[in-house]
Design a protein with these regions (language model features):
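Short hydrophobic targeting helices and cationic amphipathic motifs
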Residues: 4-6, 10, 19-22, 35
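Cationic, low-complexity basic patches in intrinsically disordered or flexible, solvent-exposed regions
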Residues: 13
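Auxiliary alpha/beta "docking" domains used to position bulky ligands
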Residues: 36-221, 260, 269
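Iron-sulfur cluster-binding cysteine motifs and their immediate structural context
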Residues: 52, 227-251, 268-295
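A short, charged helix-loop
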Residues: 208-211, 247, 252-255
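Alpha-helical scaffold domains
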Residues: 260-346
């Protein structure tokens, strides 16, 4: 380990060692600033810090207009398969051009966070909740982590301007993740990582700082496999990695307002909130390690809930158990609508 690596490592622990006598640590200010030199060094330390914060992977790409991805988004919107998700058409230019989001944007830092749970629902007859919603809302968790990463960048460089994005702003997250070398787009439209599968959250920092950009060799490792397409109970996965959003169980149970169409009766396979069927059958998700994020751990109470418990589930139960959870998006009323629809399913 050279002196630079030692200094950086010790700064992370808020101590600096006398290089001539490593047994005598000396405390230094927590906000000590190092000015790094060179795009390569800056990029290296940003990626290292991302991993230290708990992200599972980090890549960097140039902030620029993405004409191919903009065209694909337009085709999807024009096809009329977005259902009631009209917001997808908003801020179209910003979705494909980060320079419309951050003035003078030069780099997009993409991060990946595993959320695969170590525990599952106990009762196989109980209504199923998507794994992404087991714990605290990922928007909150990842935003906190990204803000820490942003603060770190400000400490190792000249003043930097930027914004953090987690699935709640006009950003083509999967496209940026591919450019950063974090994975490829599967036939179910999900980003798939060879190391982490597809039970992953994505986030970005768009900043006006130039960095060294990853140049990944993007490969499609889906091959001839069609398990996700074959397993989808509503036929929502179309050719060319296109998903019919208006025909997806996740759309009906989370985004859809009003009643769920009668034509979907008998096709939800007991999915109460969201759907993981296309991911559960994916070969790349067969040997996953559970996440290491405490905030994503579920409340043990609802993991133990039986079918009967759900039938007697009250609004006060909902507010207590699912506080700060993704289930707050559909609210108690929406969850009960879904539950009643499932009861008609059988």
């Amino acid at each position: 380990m050279n002196d630079l690596h030692l200094l950086r490592f010790s700064w992370e622990l808020d101590i600096i060692f006398n290089l001539k006598n490593l047994t005598l640590p000396m405390l230094v200010p927590k906000r000590r600033i190092y000015f790094m030199t060179g795009l390569k060094e800056n990029s290296h330390w940003i990626k290292e810090k991302a991993l230290l914060l708990g992200f599972d992977a980090c890549g960097i790409s140039r902030a620029e207009f993405m004409p191919d991805d903009a065209s694909r988004l337009k085709d999807w919107l024009d096809a009329g398969i977005s259902g009631e998700m009209h917001y997808m058409a908003n801020h179209f230019e910003k979705r494909s051009n980060p320079q419309k989001l951050v003035e003078g944007a030069k780099s997009v830092i993409s991060v990946l966070l595993n959320y695969y749970p170590g525990e599952k629902q106990k009762d196989p007859a109980s209504p199923v909740i998507s794994k992404y919603a087991y714990g605290e809302d990922y928007h909150f968790v990842m935003k906190r982590m990204l803000k820490e990463l942003m603060a770190y960048i400000g400490e190792i460089s000249d003043p930097v301007n930027g914004r953090a994005f987690v699935d709640s702003a006009p950003v083509l997250e999967r496209a940026w993740a591919v450019r950063a070398g974090l994975g490829w787009i599967g036939k179910n439209g999900m980003l798939i990582s060879k190391e982490h599968g597809s039970f992953i959250f994505l986030g970005e920092l768009v900043i006006d700082m130039e960095l060294e950009y990853d140049k990944p060799e993007v490969k499609d490792y889906c091959g001839t496999c069609t398990r996700c397409i074959d397993a989808c109970p509503t036929g929502a996965i179309l050719p060319e990695r296109v998903v019919d959003g208006s025909n997806c169980i996740s759309y009906f149970t989370i985004e859809k307002k009003g009643d769920i169409p009668a034509k979907m009766k008998g096709r939800f396979r007991n999915r109460l909130f969201g759907c993981d069927i296309c991911q559960d059958v994916c070969p790349w998700n067969k040997r996953l390690k559970p996440h290491n994020i405490p905030e994503f751990n579920p409340d043990p109470e609802w993991l133990e809930m039986s079918e009967e418990d759900w039938a007697n589930f009250s609004e006060s139960d909902f507010n207590r158990i699912f506080k700060d959870s993704p289930l707050e998006r559909t609210k108690y009323k929406g969850l009960m609508r879904n539950l009643k629809f499932l009861q008609k399913d059988f």
